[in-house]
A protein has these predicted regions:
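Non-catalytic, conserved peripheral segments adjacent to functional cores
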Residues: 5-97, 114-115, 120, 126-137, ...
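Well-ordered alpha/beta subsegment
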Residues: 94-99, 104-111
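Short coil/turn motifs at secondary-structure junctions
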Residues: 108, 125-126
Length: 144
């Protein structure tokens, strides 16, 4: 969003897997994330999805301004991202890999394994006004 009411078109190639720091220890491994150091934004909100029923899908929206990191803390799931032109599917199954999703990217999460936990780090507090929940509306914004 550029402040003038027009949105910058986001490209799918800005979204990427970030290899998070790992400390290997025989007592158990540790991964940590520091905002603006390991990821390209400050963390203002953290939430997680769990007990997702088999066959269920999450997501199905885009954000106008929000940046996110999506991590499979336990188990696995797929994230399908779409910029209005291209689609890419990421299979997340390692707790030290985070998928960076920039603003104006449609995302859908599916293929959740039993017991999976999805952790999301967000660049801002919740705001319903930041959501685009209608794909045709998203598509027309991307093409305008």
């Amino acid at each position: 969003h550029n402040g003038s009411g027009r949105f910058y078109m986001s490209r799918i190639d800005k979204c990427k897997i970030i290899d998070l720091p790992k400390i290997h220890d025989p007592r158990g491994n540790l991964t940590f994330i520091e905002g603006t150091k390991h990821i390209p934004f400050d963390i203002k909100r953290v939430y997680f999805l769990y007990d997702v029923p088999g066959g269920a899908e999450r997501g199905g929206h885009a954000h106008k301004d929000l940046h996110q990191i999506i991590i499979a803390i336990a188990g696995s799931f797929d994230v399908v991202i779409n910029d209005g032109s291209d689609t890419q599917r990421f299979h997340l199954n390692r707790s030290y890999f985070g998928l960076y999703v920039c603003p104006m990217i449609w995302r859908e999460l599916d293929n959740f394994s039993s017991g999976s936990v999805c952790l999301v780090l967000a660049s801002d507090y919740f705001s319903e006004a930041d959501y685009i929940r209608d794909f045709p509306q998203f598509d027309s914004l991307q093409k305008s």
